[in-house]
Amino acid sequence: MMCGFTSNQSPKKLSSKKLSATNVHLEISPVKCDSPCKGYENVQASYLDTANCTTVTRGADIKDDLPLHNKENLLHRFGDLETHSDEEYSGLQDSGYSSILQNDSPCQDETDNNVSDIQLRETPKNFVQFQKPLHTLSTKNLPALRFEEAMCSTLKKMRKTSKKIDWNAVDDVVCGGNYGLENLIGKNMGLERFDILAELFHRDFKHLLTKILRHLSAMDLINVISVSTTWRKILQKDNSAYNSYKLGCKELCEKKAKVSAHTATRDESLCRVPLASVQKVAASSLCTSKKQSKNRGLSNNRHAEFIEVAQTLKNDQCLKVCVDCSSPAKYDPYLHRATCTRESCKFDFCTLCSCKYHGSKCCQTSKPRSYRVPSEPLPGSKKSKQNLRRL
């Protein structure tokens, strides 16, 4: 028989419920313990029994006297408990069991629970107000979400009143609100042509425009200023680029003056009486040679245009001449429809009546537009001369 405890049992497994304050008895072993270890265990058990007795009685008193949900009384009671514990457990500080007694006491568990309840019930309201949900955050930096919210709210209001959509109200919402949609990235994606200089000018990126214009020569600047009014404004606001443009214009004028120096004397000599007829003949021969060279250049350019457009045709398409500008047009024989490929024209016409394409409707009864040479000969032409000879 072991006396009180076994050698393998640790002192932490003791519970205050199994021991009572009034009936505390140790089991006496009938066999004498000759070894000093067993005798030390008996002394150790006696210390623990007395300590547990004191903690149980103190825990019961605190349960009866402890007020509920009162912070000031709790703090006052905690102070009293600390003084009592220092006085009562002063003799057990050297034994090493005072920490076990403080941790296992039921009084401390109850006080901790009461303090936690008070802290949960008395949470400050300001802290709860500052905790805003995520959906109430500002959307100033999110223009697409702002526009979406505005459109959804207007459509809901319209749905309540009538099932039809009032597009005028939708246009008012789109035009009236400053959502900042112009600053969205990727809104111009998919476009074949895009005016980068105009966009930079509208967004007031002057430093980028100056960097771009510095890389252009004088001839390039002359071409830039003749593109559009916005490009002209861009060039006029940049002083260095505008000055280089002026210098380029002066150089061009000087070159033209040098080229036309020999023709100027000839023009002045036309008013002279002697050798005037000879000079007129020479001038006319030069003009005819220039016209012929220009016509050859135009024909070569048109031939190149038709070849370029022919490379982009589909299997069921062919080429035709535009009715308005005589440029290459893509012709669909199944629909009898042709569209001009020139950017400034892009005339979509019916090949049967040479009018604007009318879809499945019948062609107009009026005569088609004829862009051929009129029946009457022009004055000075071969036909007119022949007619005069006949007369």
UniProtKB/Swiss-Prot annotation:
Region annotated Disordered sits at: 365-391
Keywords (A to Z) from UniProt: Cell cycle, Cell division, Cytoplasm, Cytoskeleton, Metal-binding, Mitosis, Nucleus, Ubl conjugation pathway, Zinc, Zinc-finger
List each coiled-coil range. Answer: none
One Pfam family recorded for the sequence: F-box
The organism's superkingdom is given as Eukaryota
- UniProt record, GO biological process: cell division; negative regulation of exit from meiosis; negative regulation of meiotic nuclear division; negative regulation of mitotic metaphase/anaphase transition; negative regulation of ubiquitin protein ligase activity; positive regulation of cell population proliferation; protein ubiquitination; regulation of cell cycle
Q: Name one GO molecular function term.
A: zinc ion binding
Regarding how it is modified after translation, the entry says: Proteolysed; proteolysis is induced by both cyclin B-cdk1 and cyclin A-cdk1/2 complex through probable phosphorylation. Proteolysis is inhibited by pin1 during G2.
Zn-finger (ZBR-type) residues: 318-366
Residue ranges of the F-box domain?
198-245
Which positions carry the signal peptide feature in this UniProt record? none
Segments traversing the membrane: none
Q: Where does Zn(2+) 1 bind?
A: C322, C325, C340, C345
Q: Which InterPro entries match?
A: F-box-like_dom_sf, F-box_dom, FBX5_43, ZF_ZBR
Subunit info? Answer: Part of a SCF (SKP1-cullin-F-box) protein ligase complex. Interacts with btrc. Interacts with skp1. Interacts with cdc20. Interacts with pin1; stabilizes fbxo5 by preventing its association with btrc in an isomerization-dependent pathway; this interaction is present during G2 phase and prevents fbxo5 degradation. Interacts with plk1.
What is the role of this chain? Regulates progression through early mitosis by inhibiting the anaphase promoting complex/cyclosome (APC). Binds to the APC activators cdc20 to prevent APC activation. Can also bind directly to the APC to inhibit substrate-binding. Required to arrest unfertilized eggs at metaphase of meiosis II, by preventing their release from metaphase of meiosis II, through inhibition of APC-dependent cyclin B destruction leading to stabilization of cyclin B-cdk1 complex activity.
This chain's protein is named: F-box only protein 5
The record lists the organism as: Xenopus tropicalis (Western clawed frog)
